[in-house]
C-alpha cells in the first residue's frame, strides 16, 4: 500500500510538472500571437499603396505631448538584431517582414503541436491517477 502512495505521489508530481509546462507554452503562444498580430498590421501599413505619398500626422513623443511628423514610405529603419538598425528600401522591408511572419507562424505551430502532445500525456496521467485512486478506494 505504501508503494501505491509513492507511485500516486510521483504521478501527481509529474502531472503538476506537465501542467506547468502547458501553462508556459500557452504564455509563449500568446506572446508570439501578439507579435504576429502587430507584424501583420505593420505589413498591411507597408503594403498600403494609398499612403505612398508623404503623410502628415501627429505622433506622441511622451507625457501627453504630440509633434507633427511626416512619414515617407520609401525607406525604413529596420532592426536586424543586437540593437543594430539599418535603413532599407520599402520592398526589402516588406520581404523581410513577410519572412518574419512565416517564421512566427511556424513557431506558433510547433508550440501548438508540443502543447497538444503534452496535453495528451497530461490527460493520460490524470487517468492513471484516477485509476490508482479508484483501486485504493476499493481496497
UniProtKB/Swiss-Prot annotation:
- Care to name a GO molecular-function term for this sequence? unfolded protein binding
Q: What compartments host this protein?
A: Cytoplasm
**Similarity comment: family membership:** Belongs to the prefoldin subunit alpha family.
Binding partners and assembly? Heterohexamer of two alpha and four beta subunits.
Pfam families linked: Prefoldin
- Give Gene Ontology CC terms: cytoplasm; prefoldin complex
Q: Which HAMAP family match?
A: PfdA (MF_00308)
Tell me the protein's name.
Answer: Prefoldin subunit alpha
Which terms under GO biological process does the entry name? protein folding
UniProt entry keywords in alphabetical sequence: Chaperone, Cytoplasm
Which N-terminal residues, if any, form the signal peptide? none
Record NCBIfam families: prefoldin subunit alpha
Main subcellular location of this protein, as a coarse class: cytoplasm
Cross-referenced Gene3D superfamilies, in alphabetical order?
1.10.287.370
The entry's function note states: Molecular chaperone capable of stabilizing a range of proteins. Seems to fulfill an ATP-independent, HSP70-like function in archaeal de novo protein folding.
Amino acid at each position: 500500500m505504501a508503494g501505491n502512495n509513492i507511485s500516486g505521489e510521483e504521478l501527481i508530481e509529474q502531472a503538476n510538472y506537465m501542467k506547468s509546462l502547458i501553462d508556459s507554452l500557452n504564455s509563449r503562444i500568446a506572446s508570439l500571437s501578439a507579435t504576429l498580430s502587430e507584424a501583420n498590421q505593420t505589413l498591411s501599413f507597408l503594403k498600403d499603396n494609398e499612403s505612398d505619398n508623404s503623410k502628415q500626422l501627429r505622433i506622441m513623443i511622451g507625457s501627453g505631448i504630440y509633434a507633427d511628423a511626416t512619414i515617407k514610405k520609401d525607406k525604413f529603419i529596420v532592426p536586424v538584431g543586437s540593437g543594430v538598425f539599418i535603413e532599407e528600401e520599402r520592398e526589402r522591408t516588406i520581404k523581410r517582414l513577410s519572412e518574419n511572419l512565416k517564421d512566427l507562424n511556424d513557431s506558433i505551430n510547433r508550440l501548438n503541436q508540443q502543447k497538444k502532445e503534452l496535453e495528451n500525456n497530461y490527460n493520460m496521467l490524470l487517468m492513471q491517477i484516477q485509476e490508482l485512486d479508484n483501486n485504493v478506494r476499493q481496497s
